[in-house]
Amino acid sequence: MNIEELAARIDHTVLGPTTTMDEVTDVLSDAAAYGMNACIPPCYLDAAGDTDMVTDSGVTLVSVIGFPHGQHASIAKRKEAVTAWQAGADEIDVVLNIGRLKTSATETVTHDIAEVVAAVPIPVKVIIETTLLNDDEKRRACKVAVDADADFIKTSTGFANGGATTADVEVLSSYLPVKASGGISSYETAKSMLDAGAERIGASAGVEILEDAPDIYYD
């Protein structure tokens, strides 16, 4: 792939607890300039959708649901998803209920995600927070995403210790397309995730990744 194709796989991200509209505007500007997607808090979707950077460049707006811990009630996640879509989100990343997954309440967790998927006509990525799961739990989380008809599995929120690993990406990508996120701040790390099978990269360092990348094609 070339640099333009790489950029289209990056969700340039700003999701910190102190995120301001000025920071969102910077991310949107970078996304428009480099051809990336933009992942922003849901509270800024309305304003973001009204900016010329989005309307003129066609930046894909990604937002988050049940973020960052996944412990919202199902009805709240569903409402959040609908509100985000109506405010202009093109895709949503929803956090799986990790505590319930760990207590083997798989049917409840699947229903939780399926409610979100059914509520909106846009792609849904399920954040499973790999760093908090053992191997069996990772596989069960992937099965939840598949059974709920989600479109992607996302490794991490970026709020737990650790982030994406190539080993996890290899396993997760056997279930659904993978968005690797958490700790990806260089071209080499991003490339390693793509080589492991990731389809999308989530990173606050989108510009740095692209500026560090050689303008070459690779398998």
Swiss-Prot record:
A GO cellular component annotation in the UniProt record: cytoplasm
Subcellular location: Cytoplasm
EC number(s) given by UniProt: 4.1.2.4
The reaction(s) this protein catalyses: 2-deoxy-D-ribose 5-phosphate = D-glyceraldehyde 3-phosphate + acetaldehyde
Coiled coil, from the record: none
Single GO BP term: 2-deoxyribose 1-phosphate catabolic process
One annotated GO molecular function: deoxyribose-phosphate aldolase activity
Pathway(s) it belongs to: Carbohydrate degradation; 2-deoxy-D-ribose 1-phosphate degradation; D-glyceraldehyde 3-phosphate and acetaldehyde from 2-deoxy-alpha-D-ribose 1-phosphate: step 2/2
Principal localisation: cytoplasm
Top-level division of the source organism's lineage: Archaea
Main EC class the enzyme belongs to: lyase
Keywords, ordered alphabetically: Cytoplasm, Lyase, Schiff base
Active site (UniProt): 93 (proton donor/acceptor), 154 (schiff-base intermediate with acetaldehyde), 179 (proton donor/acceptor)
Pfam families: DeoC (PF01791)
Cited function: Catalyzes a reversible aldol reaction between acetaldehyde and D-glyceraldehyde 3-phosphate to generate 2-deoxy-D-ribose 5-phosphate.
Family: Belongs to the DeoC/FbaB aldolase family. DeoC type 1 subfamily.
Record's protein name: Deoxyribose-phosphate aldolase
Native source species: Haloquadratum walsbyi (strain DSM 16790 / HBSQ001)
